[in-house]
Amino acid sequence: MKRKVIPVLIGLLLIVLILAGAAGVFLFQRYSGSKEEADLNAYFGLNGSQEVAIVWNQELTEEKGLLQDERCYLKLDTVHEMLNERFYVDHNEKLLLYTLPEETVQIGIGEQTADGYTAAVEQDGDVWLALDYVKQYSDFNYALYTEPNRVVLTTNWDTLQSAELKKNTALRVRGGVKSEVLQNLEKGTKVTVLEEMENWDQVQTQDGYIGYVQKKHLTDPAEETPVKDTGYVEPDYTGNLRDHKIDLAWHQVTVESANSTFPGVMSGVTGVNVISPTWYSLYDNTGVVDGIASPSYVQQAHALGLEVWALIDDFTHREDNGVDPQEILSYTSKRTAIIEVLMSEADRCGFDGINVDFEKVTEDGSQDYIQFIRELSVACRQKGLVLSVDNYVPHNYNAHYKWAEQGVMADYVIIMGYDEHWGGSEVAGSVASLGYVTEGIERMTQEVPSEKVINAVPLYTRIWTTAEDGAVTSRAVGIQTAYDYINKNQAAATWDNSVGQNYVEFETSDGTVQIWLEDEQSLEAKINVMKEHNLGGIAAWKLGFDDGRKNIWGVISGFAAE
């Protein structure tokens, strides 16, 4: 009997041992860490030996750099997005420009710097800038690594969570021991903790790898503020900001002989300390400037204690000569020619500032426009001229006017706080309701220091007529003309608190007439908002629209007087 039992026991023991071994193998395979290494080129999304992955702060981006002559180059758009928007490329004349307070630095695309490297190269239809060149004018650090190619850009020095490895361990593509290995990290390696989870934490290494390590292998994360050691000091674009509030009035001058109307339009006007005559315009697409300025006009204005800020526009000759601001401003030589004319005219006439009123700038021409403002600011700064720039009420669709950069370069950024409803509007409405003006001021002062912001008010309104068939027409009239029309029709206006204006509506043989009036009461409401936001000034479009209602100027000057 015993002889029969022993073989059975041995068999059972063998079965148990086999099962235990199988279970052990299974458990080992399931829970032991994989040693399979990740394809690092695939991880960084690299195709070709010249591509460079970009790790921007704590993010592996989709954009790629270019490795050339052992230096890293980034596309112009990438430089704008991540590092510095002030670099400008003239694609027509093949130039790279950067504007400083007193000069615009210029180098040709493909041209070598004094240090013996190429500042900008053109490849595959794109212009690429050398990081070493960009760093001269920008506040960031970078480190370039190879095998695989990657560059780590640092532009953010906010407090981070850092930890150290308590033992040698693997950095993996994903959380889990079966995930591929990115790097084998040594005990004591410092990492930035990006996200804490239950068993695995997402971390970033100093050389740009972002992956996962087991939480148990990390010390407790601690706050750490990186040391900012870029060595960069932002230049001061100090201009000619006045030490008092600005009270500006535009004077529409369309022919040279109209300069003689200056004494008449100023009769009875009080409080104004700046007058801006519409003297200059872009004449054609070669960069010629048309001008009707008068030195005697400036002398008369100075005798009254007024500064003169000569206006230049981009629309006077748009229809007759096909003026296209982008075609002009996209050439450095044309921008330079325009600026030289304006500086020469300042010497000839003696005016005190320049007011830029470019209203036809498209999104495609945005970079060319703002570069013109930069370069003009240098010339004005050198000559002691005030530079002001006119803008539509800010909205998303006109953000390409780049208000924040205007606020750096120009002395004053003017909101043309009207045309909420204009001549081409399909529905009747206010030219400048209080809410519309307030929203414009609030948005502009988010990007431009309030002391540099001037809000312009309209001295006109629109008489709207809606016919029986629904057709809407309007005409712009001055303040007193609007009231005369209301009185003629024996109507009466009442205050509408929702728009901050007096409103009137009545019937005529032509249809329903609606008028949102601009008057002393509505202007006072707007001025109160301007005071609340501590703006740098007020402007009015335009002299003559007061229609003899001279007390309106006392209301306007109430802002600048405080």
Label the predicted regions:
Residues 225-336:
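Glycan-recognition patch characteristic of GH18 chitinases/ENGases
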Residues 188, 200-205, 213-214:
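SH3/SH3-like beta-barrel fold
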Residues 232-233, 317-318, 459-526, 556-562:
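Glycan-binding loop/region signatures in secreted carbohydrate-active enzymes
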Residues 2-197, 227-241:
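Primary recognition of N-terminal secretory signal peptides and signal-anchoring hydrophobic helices
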Residues 285-292, 340, 363-488:
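Substrate-binding surface in catalytic domains of secreted glycosidases
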Residues 247-251, 273-277, 308-312, 354-356, ...:
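Hydrophobic faces of well-ordered beta-strands that scaffold small-molecule active sites
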Residues 271, 279, 337-368, 412-427, ...:
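Active-site groove signature of glycoside hydrolases
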Residues 258-283, 341-354, 526-537:
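Catalytic domains of carbohydrate-active enzymes, especially glycoside hydrolases
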